[in-house]
Every structure is written in structure tokens, then in C-alpha cells.
């Protein structure tokens, strides 16, 4: 039986029972997660200064929330920007949970001048679910200087303003907030003004300029002040504004005359208008307060007012009536000067006029006729004017004579009371266009009376002057790649003639420039003389040319003159640098090798580039843009040499990737880059390229190897065949001319060191003296290359060789005195094959010595292959310059490098490329490793040497020195398989040749 108040349990439908856990439990679970403290819901606050670089760390959100990212799994942590700011200033590193700056934040642009600048973020984590609010406050830095609304303020203050007057000045604005905003103002020192600051509101002040001392415009009409606003940042920033105070004038000064009393004398026959005196008064005020008006004061009598007047503006006192000495001998005139101020002020003076008694009637000159203008080519005695004279006096006072200035090209011819004015000299309108001829008439009275008459005679023009240019020549500089029609220059010619005789037209004289008429390059405006470019100029095609401009007037006949306009095409930076060495093929990096034992400063290679531009546009600068190890390599800025900065160690990698950028000095700058792979090896024999980078497939690799083997075999065969043929030719020449030349070697007596040093210079100079008894293919090379070393070589060339590659070998002889620390440099072999004069950095000297009669040594049949050369069959092996001078006990000698495939030690010599400017990569030399180098005495040769174009090392043997003959070294060729019997036979032949030759000597000076 059921209890009261209870209800039977309702039966639930099965379909409604299933979704209950998801519909009811999920909202409850989310609400519980939001209410519970801990990592599920929290708020983080960070602060970061503005202007931080992208990537700057703000904080680690995962660590602050206690989340382990390794348990969350990928993609379980993300960040939302509340308010969707654009751009996204902050980002979250999903791997470490670090919150970092994504883009540069400018607080002033983001929040303007709000006290707090916040970025609100939301961090969401899944499994377990966590929602965290993140507030990042952007802190202000003092990155803005105070700035006034206007840089200059103009104030106008009357000099009557009393001290204490105030003038409002606009305050400065600073986008920063807090202490970084404007804090103080400073005013430059002034005895008249001071600055008063009144607080207006928070971080805002009212500026007032206060007058503390009265102004006087007459002492200083303009005052310059500097107002400075300083913020409170560390370091403080400031901004300035210029304040110019102009003092306005008030009428506080009276006019004053130069003298209080003026005394003058005046003839009684002075006609009306005669100037009595010119008065001058001054007023230090300005404007209307300083403008003066002259007048006769009330103290002047009416009679004097009838005889004299004064000009109100100029102060000139003139006669207006007839004067008579018998009536009055003197007059007193009172004059006042009044300014035009609001309250006019006046100054006074007195003029005393004394009348001088003279003859009352002066002669009168009457112009009867005037023939003007007169042509400038008028002949002498041409009549210009007809004059007559009259005098009211009688007797001797009536007799009048006329006169002219003696310097005028005119004269007077008189008959009775009439005169004619005629031409007496040459006229030139360009020198004097108008003559104001003053005719003087004098009577015979006592005292004599004189009157003047001025005649204006104009000279008419004839075309007697050609146009004249303002400049002797014009120099026009125009940048290349100009637009057609651009104005080059305006030539101007003047013609001192007038009217049509002075109208000038311009034209170009016909001539050809590079086979084209001048009008194909330049046109001219016939009226203005403006020269225009017809086409675009190219500096690389031609750099300058000239045109001849003719100026011609329109006279009859026309006259003309010419001037030369030189047009110089100015180079533009329109060519990027071109990298000559090292070069890469098939978009692969150039390959260089460095031994692991290389010391600091080791020369890895040298980047050689050129620029087709000129001047500073062709100045090249080398930069290391990218490298695997930033502190292991460096590149010289101007030479392009890549060197090691420290000693290679075991910790160094096996290969390094370098990117060298070459920039020119143009505007804008152009650049080129080259990628270089540097391999670090223990020994030269281990130098192998990274074939995995460049070989695309085994088939391609096998094809390249096959082609390389065929090419090397062909070159070796041709080289050996050439050596044999040349040896036969030299032996034949020896028989024909009696010189010591056999076995591919020519002997010449060695010069003294002083001679070698004296003949070294910076220009290529090949000299073959008359009667030189030496083979023309034996030369000595001295010069300075692009490297920072000095070189000296002797080259033995084969007769008739068509190759542009020289083989240099060392003599071991003393080099002679030279600059301290001089080192060897490699010369481009192309400069030694008939192209002298094209490279100003080398010197070629042909020895002018007697031919040595010593018997040459026999070849040594010892050929050895180098492991590095075997590696060179698979890659491009570049070599480095060598031949460093060393001071030995007997004077300067040279260290002889050797290379042997059987030498495993790191001290063995290494093969490096010659990397100087203009160096042919086929010329190979050697460089010692960092270990103990082989010390060779004077006259010694290395045991082995590399033949260009052949993968072999040639043994160089040296016979013991003999006191009766010169030291000789020979390069011998042969194979290891030759028998000792063959050697003995050759030595026997050599002994027999010594007996025949006698005292012949050989000079071995190749390096």
C-alpha cells in the first residue's frame, strides 16, 4: 500500500532516456569548469614595452597555466585576439607555449594617449579544457620628442606697451604618456621677456610670454627667442620653436635738420627754378611717423614767399621770382619739417640767402634746326644742328662765343651769330647711343655771362657687329638613358646692334657623329637657342661629342658667329656587377677546399667581379651575406678575399656554404651574388666534391665522368706530343743559332737583383733590345696584381705555342732589394702573349744578357700522379697563389712547395687556385701547409711540379753545385716505367755535351 503524499514513479520512454547525459551533463560540466579555480579558468597579465622587435618574448602561457604541452598533443592550444585587432601583434608558439611579439607595436598608434594600453587575449586548451584570459599591457617608451604646433611664432608688440604685458604661446604636444610627455619649458635668455607657466589640467600647461622690460624700436626692432619643450624620459627629448617679436613704432621722435641755419649765395640773375639749397631732415621713427613734409613756416614774409618756394617732398628751395641785388642783398627763409604721425611733430631751421651782384643779361642760345638721329657711319663735317646766339646786353657784353666739350666727336663752325654743329670724329652707337651735347655761350662782359644749351643727338644703328655668345664654349653634362626631347642647354648670343640687326637666330652647323648627322643627336630652337636631345644617349657607346652652334642676325648683310657645345654623357648605374671568379655551373655553388690545418687568415679564395659602369658606379664592395659559420670566415670589403678568421679545428664542420654579395657604389646600388661551398679536409688527397648536391642521376654522373676522362686523356696526349715537337724544334734552333736550348728549356744568364727591382713598374713594358742573343720565348714577368702581394716570375714559353697559359717555376735565386715584405702575385698569362698595354698592373722585361754555354741537364723520367689531381677528375679544383718570400741566411730566398701523393701528413703542400685579378686558372702553383715548410737554399727547385692541363706531378731534379759552372734546375718529363739504363744513357749524353759547350750557363728563374 502506498504512503500518503507519495506519487508512483513515472515510466520514462526509452528514446527520451538516451540523450539525458549529453543534454544535462554537458552544460553542468562547462559551468563547473568555469567556476572551479585552477588551470581550467584563469587570467594572466603581462607587460611588454612598445617598439619591440618581432619575436620578442612576452611570457610563457603554458608554464604560467601549469600545462604540459607534451600531454596536450599538437593543436590543443590556441589563442584568440579579443576585439579582433588588426594586425595580430602577438602570437603563441604552439610547441613551447611562449607568447611572443608578432609585429612591431606602436603604443601611440594603438591607444593614442590613454593612460593604459591593453591587448586582451584568450588562450584555449583542449584535453583538459582550459580557458585563460590574458591581458598584455603595452608600456610606453620615450620614442617621441615634444613638438610645437608651429615651428615659428610671429609676435608684434608696440614699443609703447608697458612691462607686464602677456602674450599667449601654444604648448608643445608629445604623443608619449606619463613621465615621457612634456614636463618643462625653457626660454632662451632675454632681458625683455620671460616665460610664465600655468597649469591647465593634468600634463598640460598654459604658456605665456611676459614683457618684463620696456621696448624701444629705435634700439632693437626685432627680438629672436627660442622656446624649448623638454619631456621627462630618460634620456630626455626636446623640441624647439622660434619666436620672433617685431617691435611696432610709435611717434615719439621729432624731425631734426642737419643744421639749424643754412647760408647760401645766389646770383641776382638766377632764373626761376634755380636751386637755392636742398634741406635734409631725419626722423628715427618708421612708417608714417618717419615720413616728413617740408614747408615755409609762418615766420617767412610774403615777399620771400613770392621769390622762393620749397618742395614738400625733397626739401629743395628754389627761386620762383626775379632777383635784384639793388632791391635786396639778402633774404631770410624759415622752413619747418613735419612728420605724418597721429600727433604730428615738427622741426625748424633758417636759410640765409645772400644775393651776388652780376651782369644781368646772359647770352641766349637758340636752336634753329636739329638733324637727329645721325647714322653711326656718318662722315666728318656732316651737319648735325644749326644754332644762333643772342645777348640783350650791348657793346662788348653783346659779343658771344660758343664752346663744346673737347672729348665729343663734334665741333662748332661759326659765321656771325650763327653756328653749325658738325661731326668731327667716328661715331659708334654701341658705345654711345645718345649724346647730350652741352653748348656753352659766353659774352665779353666783365664779369662774363655764360649760358648753356643741351642738345640731344641720337645715333642710328647700322649692322656692324656680329652676334657674340656669352660663353667661349659650353659644357653640357647629361645622364645616359635620358628621355628624347630633354633640354640639354640654352646657348645665348647678344648683338649690340638694335632692331632687326640685333635679332639673332640659332642653327647647328652640319657635321657627322659616328657616321650620323648631328641632327640625329641634337636639335636646337632657332629662336631661343635651346639645345634638345633627339635620342637617348648611352654612356657605354660614346661618352662625349661636340656640336657647333651658329648665331646669325637679320641685318643686311647678316653677320654670324659660332660656339662649340661639348656634350658629356654622364654614366648611370645601369649595370650590375658581374662576377668573373669563382663561377658556378648548372646553378650549383662554386667549390673551394681548405685544409683542416689552415691557420687564421688563410686565403680560401678570392671573388673577382667587374662592373661595366665607370667612376664611383664601378666601385665594388664585397660582403659576406650568408654563411654556415658566422665567425669562421670573413671577406675583405674591397679585395673580395675570403679568409679564415681563426684556425681550423676538429670542431669545424666538413663543408660550409657561403654567399658573397658584390655591390657597386651607384645610386641605387646594384649587386650580384655567388654561392661558394668550402670543404674542410684533412689532406689534399681527400678533397672530393659533394656529388650528392650536384649529380642529378647516376646516368648523368657517369656521362660527365666519361666526358672528363676523354677530355683529360686528349689534353694529356696533345700536351705530351707538343712537348716532344717543341723539344725537337729547340734542339734544331740550338744547332742553327748556337744557343743553349734543348729538352724544352732555354738558358739565359740571371740578372742581378738590383736590375730586376729597378725595372719593376706599374705599366706593361715589353722591350727586346737590338742584338739580343736569347730566345724570344724566354721572358721575365714582374708586376702587381689585384692581390696585396708583389710577384716576380720568369716564364719559359714554347716556340709557336698557341696557348694563353704560362708555366712558372721557381729559380731559388735571390730576388734583389725591394720593398720590405714583398710577396709574389700571379700575372694573367694573357697579358704575356702579345697583349701588352691592356693591363696596367704588370711589367714584362726581356733579359738582355749573353747566352749561357753550360750544358743543359737531361730530363728525368719520373712522373707521379697526385691524389688531389685524381680527385680533380671528378670536380673543379681551384688553386691558390703561392711563392712567399722568405729571408734566409744568405739573403732573401723562396720556400719551395712540394706535393706528393705519398705524403699523408697535414704538413704536406696543398694545391690552391691563383685568385688574383686576371689570373688564368690553368696556371698552378703550390703553397705549404701550416707545418714545418721545406727549406730550400738558393738555386734549388722543388722535387715535384704540376704541369698545366695535365694531371701529373713532374719531378724536378737538381745536380750538385759546381764552383766552375752556374747552378741550373730543369723540368724533366717521362714515365715511371722508364728503366735506369735509359737514365744512364742520357747522363752520358749530357757529359759529352758539357765537354762540347764549355762554359755555357743557364738561368732558372721560374716560379
UniProtKB/Swiss-Prot annotation:
Residue span of region Disordered: 885-1007
Comp. bias intervals (Basic and acidic residues): 966-980
Keyword Transmembrane helix appears in the UniProt entry: yes
Membrane topology note: Single-pass type I membrane protein
Topological region Extracellular: 43-708
Cellular-component GO terms for this entry: plasma membrane
Top-level taxon: Eukaryota
GO molecular function: calcium ion binding
Positions on the Cytoplasmic side per record topology: 730-1007
Placement of PXXP repeats on the sequence: 856-859, 889-892, 930-933, 948-951
Transmembrane segments: 709-729
Name of one Pfam family that matches: Cadherin_2
Keyword line: Calcium, Cell adhesion, Cell membrane, Glycoprotein, Membrane, Repeat, Signal, Transmembrane, Transmembrane helix
Glycan attachment residues as annotated in the record: 280, 436, 586, 657
Subcellular location: Cell membrane
SUPFAM superfamilies: Cadherin-like
Secretion signal span: 1-42
Primary residence: membrane
Domain called Cadherin: residue spans: 43-148, 149-257, 258-365, 374-469, 470-579, 594-691
Function description: Potential calcium-dependent cell-adhesion protein. May be involved in the establishment and maintenance of specific neuronal connections in the brain.
Protein name: Protocadherin alpha-C2
Organism: Homo sapiens
Amino acid at each position: 500500500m502506498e504512503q500518503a503524499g507519495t506519487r508512483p514513479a513515472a515510466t520514462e520512454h526509452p528514446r527520451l532516456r538516451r540523450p539525458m547525459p549529453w543534454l544535462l551533463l554537458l552544460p553542468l560540466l562547462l559551468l563547473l569548469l568555469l567556476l572551479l579555480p585552477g588551470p581550467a579558468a584563469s587570467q594572466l597579465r603581462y607587460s611588454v614595452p612598445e617598439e619591440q622587435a618581432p619575436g620578442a618574448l612576452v611570457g610563457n602561457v603554458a608554464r604560467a597555466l601549469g600545462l604540459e604541452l607534451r600531454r596536450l598533443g599538437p593543436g590543443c592550444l590556441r589563442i584568440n585576439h579579443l576585439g579582433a585587432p588588426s594586425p595580430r601583434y602577438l602570437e603563441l608558439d604552439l610547441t613551447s607555449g611562449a607568447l611572443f611579439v608578432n609585429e612591431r607595436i606602436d603604443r601611440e598608434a594603438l591607444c593614442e594617449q590613454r593612460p593604459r594600453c591593453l591587448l586582451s587575449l584568450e588562450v584555449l586548451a583542449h584535453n583538459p579544457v582550459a580557458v585563460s584570459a590574458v591581458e598584455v599591457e603595452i608600456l610606453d617608451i620615450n620614442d617621441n620628442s615634444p613638438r610645437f604646433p608651429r615651428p615659428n611664432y610671429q609676435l608684434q608688440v608696440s614699443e609703447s606697451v608697458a612691462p607686464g604685458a602677456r602674450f599667449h604661446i601654444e604648448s608643445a604636444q608629445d604623443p608619449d604618456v606619463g613621465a615621457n610627455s612634456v614636463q618643462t619649458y625653457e626660454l632662451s635668455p632675454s632681458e625683455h621677456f620671460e616665460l610664465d607657466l600655468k597649469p591647465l589640467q593634468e600634463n598640460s600647461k598654459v604658456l605665456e610670454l611676459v614683457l618684463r622690460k620696456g621696448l624701444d624700436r629705435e634700439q632693437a626692432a626685432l627680438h629672436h627667442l627660442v622656446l624649448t619643450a623638454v619631456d621627462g624620459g630618460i634620456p630626455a627629448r626636446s623640441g624647439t620653436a622660434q619666436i620672433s617679436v617685431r617691435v611696432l613704432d610709435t611717434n615719439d621722435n621729432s624731425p631734426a635738420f642737419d643744421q639749424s641755419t643754412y647760408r647760401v649765395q645766389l646770383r641776382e640773375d638766377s632764373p626761376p627754378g634755380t636751386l637755392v639749397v636742398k634741406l635734409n631732415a631725419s626722423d628715427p621713427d618708421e612708417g608714417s611717423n618717419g615720413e616728413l613734409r617740408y614747408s615755409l613756416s609762418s615766420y617767412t614774409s610774403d615777399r620771400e614767399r613770392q621769390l622762393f618756394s620749397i618742395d614738400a617732398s625733397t626739401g629743395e628751395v628754389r627761386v620762383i621770382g626775379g632777383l635784384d641785388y639793388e632791391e635786396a642783398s639778402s633774404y631770410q627763409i624759415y622752413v619747418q619739417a613735419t612728420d605724418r604721425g597721429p600727433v604730428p611733430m615738427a622741426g625748424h631751421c633758417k636759410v640765409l640767402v645772400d644775393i651776388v651782384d652780376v651782369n644781368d643779361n646772359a647770352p641766349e642760345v637758340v636752336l634753329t634746326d636739329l638733324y637727329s638721329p645721325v647714322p653711326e657711319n656718318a662722315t666728318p663735317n656732316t651737319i648735325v644742328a644749326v644754332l644762333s646766339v643772342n645777348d640783350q646786353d650791348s657793346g662788348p657784353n653783346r659779343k658771344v662765343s660758343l664752346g663744346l666739350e673737347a672729348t665729343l666727336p663734334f665741333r662748332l663752325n661759326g659765321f656771325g651769330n650763327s653756328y653749325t654743329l658738325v661731326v668731327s670724329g667716328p661715331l659708334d652707337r654701341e658705345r654711345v647711343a645718345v649724346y647730350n651735347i652741352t653748348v656753352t655761350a659766353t659774352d665779353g662782359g666783365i664779369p662774363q655771362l655764360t649760358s648753356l644749351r643741351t642738345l640731344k643727338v641720337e645715333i642710328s644703328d647700322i649692322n656692324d657687329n656680329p652676334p657674340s655668345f656669352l660663353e667661349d664654349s659650353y659644357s653640357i653634362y647629361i645622364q645616359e638613358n635620358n628621355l628624347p626631347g630633354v633640354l640639354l642647354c640654352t646657348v645665348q648670343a647678344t648683338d649690340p646692334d638694335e632692331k632687326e640687326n640685333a635679332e639673332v637666330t640659332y642653327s647647328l652647323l652640319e657635321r657627322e657623329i659616328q657616321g650620323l648627322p648631328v641632327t640625329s643627336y641634337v636639335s636646337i630652337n632657332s629662336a631661343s637657342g635651346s639645345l634638345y636631345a633627339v635620342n637617348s644617349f648611352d654612356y657605354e657607346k660614346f661618352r662625349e661629342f661636340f656640336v657647333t652652334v651658329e648665331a646669325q642676325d637679320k641685318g643686311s648683310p647678316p653677320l654670324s658667329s659660332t660656339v662649340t657645345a661639348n656634350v658629356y654623357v654622364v654614366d648611370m648605374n645601369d649595370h650590375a656587377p658581374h662576377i668573373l671568379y669563382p663561377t658556378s655551373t648548372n646553378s650549383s655553388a662554386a667549390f673551394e677546399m681548405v685544409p683542416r690545418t689552415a691557420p687564421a687568415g688563410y686565403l680560401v679564395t678570392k671573388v673577382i667581379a667587374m662592373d661595366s659602369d665607370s667612376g664611383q658606379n664601378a666601385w665594388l664592395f664585397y660582403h659576406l651575406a650568408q654563411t654556415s659559420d658566422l665567425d669562421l670566415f670573413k671577406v675583405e670589403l674591397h679585395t673580395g678575399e675570403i679568409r679564415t678568421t681563426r684556425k681550423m679545428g676538429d670542431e669545424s664542420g666538413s663543408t660550409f656554404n657561403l654567399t658573397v654579395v658584390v655591390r657597386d657604389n651607384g645610386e641605387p646600388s646594384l649587386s650580384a651574388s655567388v654561392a661558394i661551398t668550402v670543404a674542410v679536409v684533412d689532406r689534399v688527397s681527400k678533397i672530393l666534391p659533394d656529388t650528392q648536391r650536384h649529380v642529378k642521376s647516376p646516368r648523368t654522373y657517369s656521362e660527365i665522368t666519361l666526358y672528363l676522362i676523354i677530355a683529360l686523356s686528349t689534353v694529356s696526349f696533345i700536351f705530351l706530343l707538343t712537348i716532344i715537337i717543341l723539344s725537337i724544334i729547340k734542339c734544331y734552333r740550338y744547332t742553327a743559332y748556337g744557343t743553349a736550348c734543348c729538352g724544352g728549356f732555354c738558358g739565359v744568364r740571371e740578372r742581378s737583383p738590383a736590375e730586376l727591382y729597378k725595372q719593376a713598374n706599374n705599366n706593361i713594358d715589353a722591350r727586346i733590345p737590338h742584338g739580343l742573343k736569347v730566345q724570344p720565348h724566354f721572358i721575365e714577368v714582374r708586376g702587381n696584381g689585384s692581390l696585396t702581394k708583389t710577384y716576380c716570375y720568369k716564364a719559359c714559353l714554347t716556340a709557336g705555342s698557341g696557348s694563353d697559359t704560362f708555366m712558372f717555376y721557381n729559380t731559388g735565386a735571390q730576388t734583389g732589394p725591394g720593398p720590405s715584405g714583398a710577396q709574389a702575385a700571379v700575372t694573367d698569362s694573357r697579358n704575356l702573349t702579345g697583349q701588352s698595354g691592356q693591363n696596367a698592373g704588370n711589367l714584362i722585361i726581356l733579359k738582355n744578357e749573353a747566352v749561357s754555354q753550360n750544358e743543359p741537364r737531361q730530363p728525368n723520367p719520373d712522373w707521379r700522379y697526385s691524389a688531389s689531381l685524381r680527385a680533380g677528375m671528378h670536380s673543379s679544383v681551384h688553386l691558390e697563389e703561392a711563392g712567399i718570400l722568405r729571408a734566409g741566411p744568405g739573403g732573401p730566398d723562396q720556400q719551395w712547395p712540394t706535393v706528393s701523393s705519398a705524403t699523408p701528413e697535414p704538413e704536406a703542400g696543398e694545391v690552391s687556385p691563383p685568385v688574383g685579378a686576371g689570373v688564368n686558372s690553368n696556371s698552378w702553383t703550390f703553397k705549404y701547409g701550416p707545418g714545418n715548410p721545406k727549406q730550400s737554399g738558393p738555386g734549388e727547385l722543388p722535387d715535384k711540379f704540376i704541369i698545366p692541363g695535365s694531371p701529373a706531378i713532374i719531378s724536378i731534379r737538381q745536380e750538385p753545385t759546381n764552383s766552375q759552372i752556374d747552378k741550373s734546375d730543369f723540368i724533366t718529363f717521362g714515365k715511371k716505367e722508364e728503366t735506369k739504363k735509359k737514365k744512364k744513357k742520357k747522363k752520358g749524353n749530357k757529359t759529352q755535351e758539357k765537354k762540347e759547350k764549355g762554359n755555357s750557363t743557364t738561368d732558372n728563374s721560374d716560379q
